[in-house]
From Swiss-Prot:
InterPro entries: Coagulation_fac-like_Gla_dom, GLA-like_dom_SF, GLA_domain, Peptidase_S1_coag_factors. The lineage of its organism: Eukaryota, Metazoa, Chordata, Craniata, Vertebrata. This is Transmembrane gamma-carboxyglutamic acid protein 3. It holds the Pfam family Gla. Residues 20-78 are extracellular. GO terms for cellular component: extracellular region; membrane.
Amino acid sequence: MAVFLEAKNAHAVLKRFPRANEFLEELRQGTIERECMEEICSYEEVKEVFENKEKTMEFWKGYPNAVYSVRDPSQSSDAMYVVVPLLGVVLLIVIALFIIWRCQLQKATRHHPSYAQNRYLASRAGHNLPRVMVYRGTVHSQGESSGHREAGNNPQIVMGPSRGGRTTVRLESTLYLPELSLSRLSSATPPPSYEEVTAPQEGSSEEASVSYSDPPPKYEEIVAASPSADK
């Protein structure tokens, strides 16, 4: 059964469908010569494209030789249509990963300060710590009561910041004014000098009469001296 169609209807039926690389064909329109060199073409496909027997035979005579011949160097530019988009996508991915890494690093450094900042904060906190001094003495003040005078012999703790005033605190948690601690320190006797410490001290008459160079007393002398002491 023969079917005859007009030219317009025949072109509609025998239309050419796009290949898998339709996107690249939109960038660079292909020809039958390049397509047949990239793929294996049949005689019917070439005939449908040229729609002319003379042109079809002319192409078909040279086609077997073109399959095994070296391709034109200009056709190597077709690979650029594949390589350039892939490189662009890879570059965008690398830039996005770098931006994400920088954001994460800034968040980490914001929550955890650096080692230098930690040392600065630690040294600054160490300077603000209070100083504690424990001493014994008696508080002398006109406005102090008798109960305070009796408790003056107890150990005292002086606390105060390194840069501010000092306060005096008793072990029984009794607070005194800073002036009392200052008066205590001003009225305290100075320590003895080296000459006073090394000078020979005068003892009692009994200690002076004893000579350590004499021999010890005998047993008879001790026994004779004990009855007289009992009497």
